[in-house]
Amino acid sequence: MANPLKKTMVYLGLADEELEFEEEQTQHQPRREAAAPASVQPVPHPAAVAPVQNRAPVTPLRKSSTARNAPVQEMNEILTVHPRQYRDAQAIAESFREGIPVIINLSQMSEGDARRLIDFASGLSQGLYGKIERVTPKVFLLSPSHIVVSGEHGGQEAEVDASFFAQA
């Protein structure tokens, strides 16, 4: 196996390795007439072993129609929450997942926890294809995708710089 191309092909697993060493030994040794022929078993090489394929589920990049959406029904309930701590976010998430609009009043929370809760609520609404709107400086409305909110939207856009979201 003096050919470099052949060595490369063997290394990459594209060709089988020739057993030159065994051929050289059989040429120099005298034949034994009384001995039974020995069976030679090939040694498996790493390149000859089939690779193990691991499969994992693929997450689609776009919204698929099989995504679990809240059932579209007549809206007959709106939940109003006055959280005092960040751990109250679980009740907000459970109601929003069921398709219930949630009004969050942050006036009783510390500013740090209120920011965390709004970050959580923003992610929740994005993940479930809903939207979040600021009603007053410390009151927010989480509306699921099947709920349409109408009202005045002019003028509120200009207040974004002075809003609760403004980073100092």
UniProtKB/Swiss-Prot annotation:
Database matches in InterPro entries: Cell_div_SepF, Cell_div_SepF/SepF-rel, SepF-like_sf
Pfam families recorded: SepF (PF04472)
Region named Disordered: 21-73
Keyword Cell cycle found: yes
Family listed: Belongs to the SepF family.
Functional summary from the UniProt entry: Cell division protein that is part of the divisome complex and is recruited early to the Z-ring. Probably stimulates Z-ring formation, perhaps through the cross-linking of FtsZ protofilaments. Its function overlaps with FtsA.
Keywords on record: Cell cycle, Cell division, Cytoplasm, Septation
Gene Ontology biological process: division septum assembly; FtsZ-dependent cytokinesis
Subunit structure: Homodimer. Interacts with FtsZ.
Location(s) in or outside the cell: Cytoplasm
Amino-acid biosynthesis in keyword set: no
This protein's name: Cell division protein SepF
Native source species: Leifsonia xyli subsp. xyli (strain CTCB07)
PANTHER family noted in UniProt: CELL DIVISION PROTEIN SEPF (PTHR35798:SF1)
GO cellular component: cytoplasm
Biased composition (Low complexity): 35-52
